[in-house]
Curated annotation (Swiss-Prot):
Organism: Edwardsiella ictaluri (strain 93-146)
Quaternary structure note: Forms oligomers.
Keywords: Cytoplasm, DNA-binding, Repeat, Repressor, Transcription, Transcription regulation
Function: Negatively regulates its own expression and that of the subsequent genes in the proximal part of the division and cell wall (dcw) gene cluster. Acts by binding directly to DNA. May also regulate the expression of genes outside the dcw cluster.
GO molecular function: DNA-binding transcription factor activity; transcription cis-regulatory region binding
GO term, biological process aspect, one: negative regulation of DNA-templated transcription initiation
HAMAP family (alphabetical): MraZ (MF_01008)
Protein name listed in UniProt: Transcriptional regulator MraZ
Localization per record: Cytoplasm, Nucleoid
GO cellular component: cytoplasm; nucleoid
Disulfide bonds: none
Amino acid sequence: MFRGATNINLDSKGRLAVPIRYRDLLIEEAQGHMVCTIDLHHPCLLLYPLSQWEVIEQKLSRLSSMNPAERRVQRLLLGHASECQMDGAGRLLITATLRQHAGLHKQVMLVGQFNKFELWDEETWYQQVREDIEAEQSATEIPSERLQDLSL
């Protein structure tokens, strides 16, 4: 399980050093093989261990290519998916196309989200956090039953 937000610098080649606390788990779970793709709703990337991505691919393969909405999701997620292998120094190369899509510059945030990571431009991440907090503070809708059962 991946949790927490970590500031990371991309090097000049677009590589990020995976935090040490995740490296052993990623090697154990997927031999350091990862898949990076776009997020459909936010200006960030999604980074999955290969074993977790294969579950997503199975679900995507069951969607109908004849349904326009389902085909769009397949096209966007699979069409942008890029395999990346953690090197001996624990770094992952994020392709230029994906970096450009998410507006990634030197400072990025690696955000654990259970079975995957989100990869954000640092400034964009902090802006999103502010917006999310403001939305929660001003929310007028009744929380879903699942949120009502969540006790923090």
